[in-house]
C-alpha cells in the first residue's frame, strides 16, 4: 500500500514553518524537514531554524542531525525520509514533508536510484580547487566545451551543479541531461503536493525583514562562533545564504551595510528560483497567503487533504 504524505513547499520566508505546524496539530502529524541547511547543528539563526518554542511540541525530524563539516547528500535525505515516513505511518501519525530544497522534494516524488549514481571524489575535489583558484567561469567553460546543452540550463555561479555535470560526463560519457531523463514517479508514496506563495512585493518585504531580524538576533556572532570552533569558510555549509555574506564581511570584503544588502538581494533571487523550480510540478496546488488569512488557508488545505486521502 502506498504511504500517504503531505508535501508542503514554497520559497523562503513564505510561511512554511507556521503552516506546517498548524497542519500537524490538526492532522496529528509529524514534520520531516526538507531544508538542506537546517540539517546542521550550531547553525540556527542563518537557517531560520524553528526554536523548540516555535515547534510547539510537534516532532520535527532531520533538523540538527549533523555537524557543519559533515556530508549529507540527496541520497542520504531520500533514505532517511523513507525511514521516517515508514516509522511515522506505523505510529498512526501523518507525515508532512515541509521545506524548500527542490532536490529533496524530487527524491521523494520520483524514483531516483542513487545507489549507482556516478561520482568521482578525486575529480570533484580537483574541480572545486580549480573553481577556487581560477574562478567559477573557468569550470563553467569546461562544461560549455563538453556538454553545451547542460551549460545552457545551469547558472555559471551554481558551481556545485556545474561540477556535478562535469563529473557525470567524465565518468559515464553521458550528458548530464541524458543522465536525468529516465526518472519516473515514485510508486512508494501517495503524495499531495501543496505550494505556498505570496504576492511578490509582500514576499520580498518578508525576506528583507527576516534578514534584518537575523542580524539583530545575532547572526554575526553565530558565524564568529562557528569560525572560532575551527570550522573553515570553505565548508559547503558556509556556502548557504547568510553565512557566505557574513564571512565576506568578517574578511573585509564588504562593510556590514553592503553585506546585508547583498544578502537581501541574493535571498530574493533564491526565492525566485525556488518558485520557478516548484512551478515545474504539474501536480502542485498553490495557495496564496496574501489573499486570505492564515486560518482560512489552513482550513482550505485541511479540506483538500481530507478529500484527497479520504480521511473524513
Swiss-Prot record:
Class of enzymatic activity (EC top level): transferase
Residues holding ATP: 10-17
Stored InterPro entries: Dimethylallyltransferase (IPR039657), IPT (IPR018022), P-loop_NTPase (IPR027417)
Marked site positions, Interaction with substrate tRNA: 101, 124
GO MF annotation list: ATP binding; tRNA dimethylallyltransferase activity
Region described as Interaction with substrate tRNA: 35-38
One BP annotation, GO: tRNA modification
SUPFAM superfamilies: P-loop containing nucleoside triphosphate hydrolases (SSF52540)
Entry binding sites for substrate: 12-17
Keyword annotations from UniProtKB, A to Z: ATP-binding, Magnesium, Nucleotide-binding, Transferase, tRNA processing
Entry's EC annotation: 2.5.1.75
Catalyzed reactions: adenosine(37) in tRNA + dimethylallyl diphosphate = N(6)-dimethylallyladenosine(37) in tRNA + diphosphate
Pfam families referenced in this protein's UniProt entry, alphabetically: IPPT (PF01715)
Required co-factors: Mg(2+)
Family as reported in the entry's similarity comment: Belongs to the IPP transferase family.
Function according to Swiss-Prot or TrEMBL: Catalyzes the transfer of a dimethylallyl group onto the adenine at position 37 in tRNAs that read codons beginning with uridine, leading to the formation of N6-(dimethylallyl)adenosine (i(6)A).
Assembly information from the UniProt record: Monomer.
HAMAP family: IPP_trans
NCBIfam families with a match to the protein in the record: miaA
Name of the molecule in the record: tRNA dimethylallyltransferase
Amino acid at each position: 500500500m502506498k504511504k500517504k504524505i503531505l508535501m508542503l513547499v514554497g520559497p523562503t520566508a513564505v510561511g512554511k514553518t507556521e503552516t506546517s505546524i498548524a497542519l500537524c496539530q490538526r492532522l496529528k502529524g509529524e514534520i520531516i524537514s526538507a531544508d538542506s541547511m537546517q540539517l546542521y547543528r550550531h547553525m540556527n539563526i542563518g537557517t531560520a531554524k524553528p526554536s523548540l518554542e516555535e515547534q510547539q511540541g510537534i516532532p520535527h525530524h532531520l533538523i540538527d542531525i549533523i555537524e557543519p563539516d559533515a556530508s549529507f547528500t540527496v541520497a542520504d535525505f531520500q533514505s532517511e525520509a523513507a525511514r521516517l515516513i515508514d516509522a511515522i505511518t506505523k505510529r498512526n501519525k501523518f507525515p508532512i514533508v515541509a521545506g524548500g530544497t527542490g532536490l529533496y522534494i524530487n527524491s521523494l516524488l520520483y524514483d531516483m536510484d542513487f545507489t549507482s549514481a556516478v561520482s568521482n571524489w578525486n575529480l570533484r575535489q580537483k574541480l572545486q580547487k580549480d573553481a577556487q583558484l581560477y574562478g567559477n567561469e573557468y569550470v563553467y567553460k569546461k562544461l560549455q566545451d563538453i556538454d553545451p546543452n547542460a551549460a545552457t540550463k545551469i547558472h555559471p555561479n551554481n558551481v556545485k551543479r556545474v561540477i556535478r555535470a562535469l563529473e557525470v560526463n567524465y565518468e559515464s560519457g553521458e550528458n548530464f541531461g541524458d543522465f536525468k531523463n529516465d526518472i519516473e514517479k515514485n510508486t512508494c508514496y501517495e503524495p499531495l503536493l501543496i505550494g505556498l506563495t505570496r504576492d511578490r512585493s509582500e514576499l520580498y518585504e518578508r525576506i528583507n525583514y527576516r534578514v534584518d531580524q537575523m542580524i539583530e538576533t545575532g547572526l554575526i556572532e553565530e558565524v564568529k562562533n562557528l569560525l572560532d570552533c575551527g570550522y573553515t569558510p570553505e565548508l559547503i555549509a558556509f556556502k548557504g545564504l547568510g553565512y557566505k555574506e557574513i564571512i565576506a564581511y568578517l574578511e573585509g570584503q564588504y562593510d556590514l551595510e553592503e553585506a546585508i544588502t547583498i544578502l537581501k538581494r541574493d535571498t530574493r533571487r533564491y526565492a525566485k528560483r525556488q518558485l520557478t523550480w516548484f512551478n515545474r510540478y504539474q501536480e502542485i496546488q498553490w495557495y496564496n497567503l496574501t489573499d486570505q488569512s492564515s486560518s482560512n488557508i489552513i482550513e482550505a488545505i485541511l479540506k483538500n487533504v481530507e478529500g484527497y486521502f479520504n480521511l473524513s
